[in-house]
Amino acid sequence: MLSYHHSFHAGNHADVLKHIVLMLILENLKLKEKGFFYLDTHSGVGRYRLSSNESEKTGEYKEGIGRLWDQTDLPEDIARYVKMIKKLNYGGKELRYYAGSPLIAAELLRSQDRALLTELHPSDYPILRNNFSDDKNVTVKCDNGFQQVKATLPPKERRGLVLIDPPYELKDDYDLVVKAIEEGYKRFATGTYAIWYPVVLRQQTKRIFKGLEATGIRKILKIELAVRPDSDQRGMTASGMVVINPPWTLETQMKEILPYLTKTLVPEGTGSWTVEWITPE
């Protein structure tokens, strides 16, 4: 079943959190001259038009990137992220397009770095391929992203980031995430892994945390932003990023960023945030 389309959700609060974390990790990898490898397991189309029927139907971006767009007091790290999105909008004042994780990563790649983008959805893959057809550093595959973790690691660069962000439309995705991490870590223990997760039902989310703890892997950081308290009702109340082998600066950076994000994205005052270690070093 491949019914999920990210265009309904592009630019929402979950994307904001995910893409700021992605940017900070890639910026850290760029501190060394040696090239790195980036794998995006569930790439989507890479770029989203916010005037599309899907985006307008939900309007989720208005409570995400839309609430940061005109802010004049952005913390430095958030300002760099917003600047990237404004570049995609041709520097204009109007927010018309939003970047998916592949486009944010491609913007940060240097000539010595490379990326592999995988997307299995039959209608999304051709768009993704077309969006990166001129980028020599980027390879696009129509394939199962979970399987690519095992197939492509370790990379020849011996440095890199794996982003795993499935839609979780299948309950198996929660277990497949943990399995992919186990397979990847066995092959590439020094790599950084970033897992995006939604909080729809907290018990499902805990399956990822418990599964990762059971692997025995160390240095697992959890970063979470909630827009409202957990609920038994259907709907995403929060989202987060689990980062294995995070840059040493990431914990501090997110603790500085999240109070501002929570206040700005959730002006109603129902938001909260967490930065904590699932397993320390």
UniProtKB/Swiss-Prot annotation:
Pfam families hit by this protein: RsmJ
User: Quick check: keyword Cell division in the entry?
Assistant: no
Q: What class of enzyme is it?
A: transferase
From the UniProt annotation, give the residues forming the signal peptide. none
Active site residues per record: D165
Annotated Gene Ontology cellular component terms: cytosol
In this chain, S-adenosyl-L-methionine is annotated as bound at: H19, H42, S101, E119, N144, G145, D165
* GO BP: any one term: rRNA base methylation
**Catalytic function, reaction form:** adenosine(2030) in 23S rRNA + S-adenosyl-L-methionine = N(6)-methyladenosine(2030) in 23S rRNA + S-adenosyl-L-homocysteine + H(+)
Q: Which domain of life is it from?
A: Bacteria
UniProt-listed Enzyme Commission number(s): 2.1.1.266
| InterPro entries, alphabetized | RlmJ, SAM-dependent_MTases_sf
- Report keywords, A-Z: Methyltransferase, RNA-binding, rRNA processing, S-adenosyl-L-methionine, Transferase
Site annotation (Interaction with substrate rRNA): which residues? Y4
Under Gene Ontology molecular function, one entry of this record is: RNA binding
Q: What does this protein do?
A: Specifically methylates the adenine in position 2030 of 23S rRNA.
* Subunit structure comment from the entry: Monomer.
**Entry's family note:** Belongs to the RlmJ family.
Name the UniProt record assigns to this protein: Ribosomal RNA large subunit methyltransferase J
Say which species the protein is native to. Answer: Haemophilus influenzae (strain ATCC 51907 / DSM 11121 / KW20 / Rd)
